[in-house]
Regions:
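Positively charged n-region of N-terminal signal peptides that target proteins for export
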Residues: 1-4
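Active-site neighborhood of HAD-like aspartate-dependent phosphohydrolases
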Residues: 79-86, 97-129
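Substrate-recognition element of Asp-dependent hydrolases with the DxDx(T/V) motif
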Residues: 95, 135-168
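Bacterial N-terminal signal peptides
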Residues: 9-17
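C-terminal cap/substrate-recognition subdomain and adjoining C-terminal extension
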Residues: 56, 161-278
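Second-shell loop/turn segments in exported
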Residues: 51-62, 121-129, 150-156, 182-184
C-alpha cells in the first residue's frame, strides 16, 4: 500500500511538471511571437525606404510624374489666353527634386528607424543630395519654355539656404538662386510662401511628395481631414498637382501621432497596429 501511494505521488509530480513545462512553453512561444511581431513592424518602417532605394517601379513612377507634369504644363500654357503675370511652377526639393535616400538608408541600417531633425539638418548641410529621376530633364525643359521655377522647401533657411542653392547648381538645376529657392524660417506651413509667389506669377503647376507641398491648407489636419481635403481636390491631381511617391516619411506620419518619430519602438508599433487594423 505504501508503495502504491509513493507511485501515485510520483505520477502527480510528473504530471504537474509536464503541465508547468507546457505553461512555460506556451508563454515562451507567446513571447517569441510578440517579439517577432514587434521586429516585423519596426522593420516595415524601413521597407518604404528600401523600395525607394531599389525598385524599378519607384523610378518609373518618378519619370511618370515628370512626364505628366510636362504634358500638363504645355496644356496649361495653351489654354491660358490672357497672361497678366509671368508663368511659373512651384515644387518641393527633398524627394521631389533632390534624392536623399542613400543617406537615409545608411542611417536606417545603423538601427535608426527614423531620422530626427538634427540628423536631417546636418545631412542636408553637406550638400550631397543626388538628383531625382527625371527631375533635371523636366526642369530644363520648363526653363526653355520661359516658365519660372520656384523651389519651396522646408529646409531651414538660416543654415541650409546657401548649401541648397550650391547643391542644385552643382547638379545643373535652373533657377538655383536666392530669388527662387524659398526655405522656411519660423513657419513650416508653405501656404504663405505660395501666396507670395502667386501675387507676382501665374502658377500653373505644383509638384511635391507631401500633401503640404500643395496649396490645400492641410498643415496640422487629422488623417480624416487630410483625406477629405484630397478627395475634394481629386480633379487637380494629374493636372495642376503632380505627386511623387514617398512612403518613407512625410506629414502623414505625424498625422497618425504628433510625437510618432520620438516614440520608442513598441509605442510606434502600437500606433502601427492601430492603423493597420482600422
Amino acid at each position: 500500500m505504501k508503495r502504491q501511494i509513493l507511485l501515485f505521488a510520483a505520477a502527480l509530480s510528473l504530471s504537474a511538471s509536464c503541465l508547468c513545462t507546457g505553461e512555460v512553453s506556451a508563454d515562451y512561444e507567446t513571447s517569441l511571437s510578440r517579439a517577432a511581431s514587434s521586429r516585423q513592424l519596426a522593420e516595415q518602417e524601413t521597407m518604404g525606404l528600401l523600395w525607394m532605394r531599389t525598385s524599378a517601379e519607384y523610378r518609373a513612377l518618378c519619370y511618370q510624374a515628370y512626364n505628366t507634369a510636362l504634358s500638363s504644363l504645355d496644356r496649361a500654357m495653351k489654354e491660358t489666353s490672357s497672361r497678366h503675370k509671368p508663368f511659373a511652377i512651384i515644387l518641393d526639393c527633398d524627394e521631389t527634386v533632390l534624392d536623399n535616400t542613400r543617406a537615409m538608408g545608411t542611417y536606417a541600417s545603423r538601427g535608426k528607424g527614423y531620422w530626427d531633425g538634427w540628423w536631417w539638418h546636418d545631412r542636408v548641410h553637406e550638400g550631397k543630395s543626388a538628383a531625382m529621376p527625371g527631375a533635371l530633364d523636366f526642369l530644363k525643359q520648363v526653363s526653355a519654355r520661359g516658365v519660372e521655377i520656384f523651389y519651396v522647401s522646408n529646409r531651414y533657411k538660416p543654415d541650409n539656404l546657401d548649401v541648397t542653392i550650391d547643391n542644385l547648381k552643382t547638379l545643373g538645376f535652373p533657377s538655383a538662386d536666392r530669388n527662387h529657392v524659398l526655405l522656411f524660417t519660423k513657419n513650416s506651413d508653405k501656404m504663405p510662401r505660395f501666396a507670395k509667389i502667386e501675387k507676382s506669377h501665374q502658377v500653373l503647376l505644383y509638384l511635391g511628395d507631401n500633401a503640404g507641398d500643395f496649396p490645400l491648407g492641410i498643415k496640422g489636419k487629422s488623417l480624416a481631414e487630410r483625406q477629405h481635403i484630397i478627395d475634394t481636390s481629386a480633379k487637380d491631381f494629374g493636372t495642376r498637382f503632380i505627386v511623387l511617391p514617398n512612403p518613407a516619411y512625410g506629414s502623414w506620419v505625424s498625422a497618425m501621432d504628433t510625437h510618432y518619430m520620438k516614440l520608442p519602438v513598441e509605442k510606434r508599433n502600437e500606433v502601427n497596429r492601430k492603423y493597420l487594423t482600422k
